[in-house]
Regions:
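Pepsin/retropepsin-fold aspartyl endopeptidases
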Residues: 19-286
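Bacterial N-terminal signal peptides that target proteins for export
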Residues: 1-9
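Bacterial N-terminal signal peptides
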Residues: 10-18
Length: 286
């Protein structure tokens, strides 16, 4: 999915959004239905300010939430310039405060958002995307994503077969994994189109994976080139995934020393995930 900067990855906002602290709230219904595209992209309906029936892409790797510039103009948001970290440097991006954002039972008031042109989604999805919603909205409560039922359930999560620690760093959810017996920290990113690994910064540093071919991959905010690699083993907690393809990207973000890549649960064949930020737990079943 190509944006105006082909290497754009929404990872870290470098210029903080100043404004009124965001308030939160809940509605009565604890469930939210979604449509699934390309077997991993989650699209839900929601509202921003007075506008309802909007299409939002849910992405746990988006930090913070992003609104399409066309929607921001319809809402008459006061947009100010800022900087966004990308794979090959920083790009300019607008910043604003949206009066309210509603997604199923989750509501945020006076929410700081990034404003960007999301028109590149037209090439990948049959619906217009009005925004990319991150954990700053949906992470207020524990929640479960059931890919088979196409449903998100908020509130206390069920006990799933596998569980491991989850921690937030700079607004991003990180999990510790083993890649062919090497330790790595990955962003849990429901919007990533594949398992994405950043090559070591140090020239000549070894890699536990085998390079096989060049391809393009993407997360929800851009497209970038990399090389296909094959992992003999990927360990998430006690669960092992064997012979998994990944994309090795040689341009690590200059601002990123905190993690080694992105992992997409759905593309590993995971059917249910549960996230509880307060307890610091990521659980899943296959």
């Amino acid at each position: 999915m190509r944006g105006r900067n082909d290497w754009l990855l929404v990872l870290v906002i470098l210029l903080a959004v100043a404004g009124v602290p965001a308030a939160s709230g809940y509605t009565k219904s604890p469930e939210l239905r979604f449509d699934l595209y390309r077997d991993y992209l989650i699209v839900v309906r929601g509202a921003a300010g007075p506008l309802k029936g909007l299409n939002f892409l849910l992405d746990t790797g988006a930090s913070p939430t992003v609104l399409d510039r066309r929607l921001a103009r319809s809402l008459h948001l006061d947009e100010r310039p800022g900087l966004l970290a990308g794979v090959n440097g920083t790009v300019t991006a607008g910043q604003a405060i949206v009066s309210s954002l509603q997604l199923g039972p989750m509501r945020r008031d006076n929410l700081p958002v990034v404003v960007e042109d999301l028109s590149f989604f037209y090439k990948a999805l049959p619906v217009h995307i009005d925004g990319v919603i991150g954990l700053d909205v949906i992470g207020q409560s524990p929640f479960e994503i059931d890919y088979g039922a196409r449903e998100i359930r908020f509130g206390p999560t069920p006990s799933l077969k596998n569980a491991l620690p989850l921690r937030m760093e700079r607004g991003l959810p990180l999990v510790d994994v083993q890649l062919d017996q090497s330790s790595a920290k990955l962003v849990l990113d429901t919007g990533a189109s594949s398992l994405i690994l950043f090559a070591p910064r140090t020239p000549g540093a070894g890699s536990p994976v085998r390079i096989s071919a060049v391809l393009q991959s993407s997360n929800t905010m851009g497209e970038f080139a990399g090389k296909t690699v094959w992992l003999h083993s990927l360990m998430l907690g006690q669960a092992e995934f064997r012979r998994e393809p990944a994309v090795l990207v040689h341009s690590r973000p200059e601002t990123n020393d905190d993690f080694d890549g992105l992992v997409s649960p759905a593309l590993l064949g995971i059917t249910k995930i549960a996230i509880d930020l307060d307890r610091g737990v990521f659980a899943f079943s296959r």
